[in-house]
Amino acid sequence: MKYSTFFPKSRKQEFKDDLSINAKYLIKAGYIDQLMAGSYTLLPLGFRVVENIKNIIREELNKTGAQELLMPLLHPRDIWDQTGRWSDPDVKQIMYQFKDIHGKEFGLSFTHEEIVMNLLGKMIQSYKDLPVKVYHFSTKFRNEPRAKSGILRGREFMMKDLYSAHVSEEDMYKYYNLVKDVYIKIFKRIGLDVLTVEASGGVFTDKNSHEFQVLSDVGEDTIYTCDCSDKSCDCKFSQNKEIFKGQDGDKCPECDDCIIKSAKSIEVGNIFPLGTKYSESQKVFYTDSEGNQKPIWFASYGIGPTRIMGALVEVFHDDKGIIWPKSVAPFQVYLVSLNKNDEAEKVCSELEGAGIEVLYDDRDISAGEKFANADLLGFPYRLVISEKSGDKIEFKERNGSDVELLSLDQVISRVGEETERLT
């Protein structure tokens, strides 16, 4: 694809110093555009990144037997009244609630527990119909009083929410723990190192839940972890500030050998064991093998693809721009031509024919401007075709400083092998 016809181009204007790194780089590089505080358009580059993130999530969830669907975002009040959450003060603070012209009350979705349970009530009759594992990717709305930090905290954002329904607590936790492990794999494939942190259930459940946190100085969350300086200690203690009862420097309550340290972090996922709260409230039961009516055991699991994109930029950047992990980059190659356009066209065609995604900067601007734009956009590889390189191609990785001269076949082999390794 040619950059000369790509929409939009990167921007040259300066941004406020207090703007978050993810907002500054994503807006400047043309990945997103801000409509208002907490609401962003995913431009073509940003859309490609989020789609790559979604595809990784989708692949791993499908392996667990989960099925994808799509549910409404506009919810009638009566379904939420069944659980009492419509009038819950904590819910009312974040849920957009309003009346239509007939006076009927509705809410914009910030989650889908009630909607899934309502669906199960129509579809589930006996234990033979369970378990059920369904998920969707959809826009969520939250009346966020602190819509800041770029796309890390918004009023409107993309969320993947998975829901599982089971015949027993044992079966629920079996799948819950499987998803916990799958989340770690998902984040690893995306390129993020995460900590699994015990947390409160918030407005979802009175049980403790688990969050997946990325360490970052710009994070709004505070977590407390066991500082295992002794390599023989394999303690995994980690809690967020809402449930941790101690302070920095305390002895670890789990291993009693190490001390507790606090850190700032960005939450990129969460999972909730909901139990039978929703099925009992909404009167959704199944018939067991002995003919008895039993409540469904329920759990929910969230990941925010747009928040992940913001977290990636906060973690992977330098003073020149973004450094995308190879698994989620919008294009693998940024191709630069310096007065050898015919040759560049041929190389671009060969690369695309080999299944490599290329953005070809064919604009009539200086080499320095093209190189700066390559660094800003942050694709894994920059290729340069020029008189100086002869019949070779200058090959440079975004997160490295070395420049190599490679043949086209070598480039295809190098990039192709790396792309294949990540799938």
State where each predicted segment sits.
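NTP/phosphate- and nucleic-acid-binding module
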Residues: M1-T423
